[in-house]
Every structure is written in C-alpha cells, then in structure tokens.
Amino acid sequence: MTKNKVLLALLAVVFLALPQSLCAQFNWKYTVEKGKIVTEVPQRAPGQTTALQLTTPKMPVVRVGFVGLGMRGPSAVERWMHIPGIEVVALCDYEAKRAEACQKILRDNSMPAAAIYSGEEGYKELCKRKDIDLVYIATDWDHHFLVAKCAMENGKHAAIEVPSAINLREIWTLIDLSEKTRLHCVMLENCCYDFFELNSLNMAQKGVFGDVIYAQGAYKHELSSFWKYYWKKNAQDKLGWRLEYNKDYRGDLYATHGLGPIAQVLNIHRGDRMRTLVAMDTKSFNGKKLVEKYTG
C-alpha cells in the first residue's frame, strides 16, 4: 500500500472514530457546522422558566448536610462555622472515619454532633432526611452530579464544588431539575467570590471601565505536591480518581477558575452568551517523570 493510501486510511479511521468519541465525551446530541461542534439546546416544558433569577423564602436557620469529607470537605465545614444562622445536621463520606473526624469541628464551635452516613450510597439516606435544607457536595467529580440530582429530587438545594457535572447530559439534567423544582443548584466557583474578583466586578458594574468589550483571565496552580495523594489508584480512600481525568482528557479540565469571574463581568446568561468555545493544552512536561517516580 502506498504512503498516500496509508495516510488516507488512517484519516478515515480518525474521522470515523471522532463522532463516537465526542458523543461519549459530551453524552449529548451535536452537529458539526463549518468545522465547529454545535450542541443542541433542549426545549423547556411549557410554563418552565429559568432559575437564574430564582429567589426562595428566607430561612431563619439553614440546615446543611455535607457529602464528601476527604481532602476538601473538612475545610468547607470549617468555613461554615463562620456563617451565622446555620446548623450542620449530617456528615457523609465514603469512609465513616472521615465523616466522624469532622465532628471535632462542630464540637470546637459549640455545635451539636451531626448524624453520620457512609458507604457508596450513604448520600441517598442523607438526602431523604426531612430536616435538611441544603446539601453541600465536595465528593470526587464522578459523584457531583449524582448527589446534586438526588438532593433536588428530595427537595433540597444543592451546592456543588467545581465542576458541577462532567458532560452535557448531566449539566442539562441539573438545569432542568432546578427549574422544575425551583430549588437552587449552585456551582461553588470560589474564584468568583475572592476579594479581587468581587472588587473588579463591582467596578465593572459601576461603569469604572466603561463598556467592557474584551477580557482575559488565567488560573495557575502547581499540583505536583498533591501527586502522592492523587496517585492512590483504586485506593480504599477514593483519592486515586483525580489523575484519571488528566490521563484520559485533553484541553482545559478546570476552566471555570479563570473563566467564571470574566463571565460575571460580561453578563453571560444575563443579557449575553458565549457562542464559541475553544480548549487546548500543551503536552505534559513533568507527568512522565512523576509517573516514573511513583511506579519505579
């Protein structure tokens, strides 16, 4: 077979595989128009309205259940201790000992002990409780959608650490549930609420910069020191999931830290929208060295 024929054969395989690959990644219908992937926007049911401006009755006390108390969850419990008018009702993690460890945070802040839930489906029992208003989700990424969906289906508001979902089907399902139940479903993009970002947003909204027509942002986070935790593939403590995403996917896996504050300044979904998105990355320069370090 000539080189040209071999090249054409390889290209044919790539293009035949591309739709299946993209469909699996998006888990959603799409078309390709002029070289761009265009995803479908689902039709709302009659009478169903957006939840972007949703307000709910004020609560004298917000009763919270936490799901996911590994690396990030305990610090979330700590932060909630500084918010007046809250009650921590339940703590849940795959491992009971991690949920139990957070009881000390409550004791140190003169709060009563919370109920403990554990195991792969402990969150389901937590979400069924009648005395919880909001479920705070800090699990591994694969469980963000599952817990948020369960929370809203059981009448609870959902607050989800980044990312809120991992494909378009999950994203649209959460939007649909929030609109139908009239419950808040919030992605906790913390970079939108730091002092610098909020100050910049306030200045933009007050016209200090005039008409904002261009914005640029970035997020840099050195994660090499976390590899000793992330490397625990199939570990009992479930920390090995993180590196799977870096291994299996390209582009920007964590775009919202840099993009979120910009979207607020540009009034995205509040009068404007994004029409085209492009994601790319460089090759991994240190990944191979770290893999060799942890595998020998």
Predicted regions and their residues:
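N-terminal Rossmann-like dinucleotide-binding module
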Residues: 26-109
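Bacterial N-terminal signal peptides
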Residues: 9-21
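Predominantly a Rossmann-like dinucleotide-binding segment in NAD(P)-dependent oxidoreductases
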Residues: 68, 181-184, 191-296
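Beta-strand-loop-alpha-helix segment that lines the small-molecule cofactor/substrate pocket
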Residues: 134, 140-141, 145-193, 207
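Short, Asp-centered acidic motifs that coordinate Mg2+ and/or phosphate
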Residues: 90, 134, 214
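A structured beta-alpha segment of the ubiquitous adenosine-cofactor-binding alpha/beta core
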Residues: 114-137
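Acidic-histidine catalytic/liganding microenvironments
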Residues: 83, 129, 194
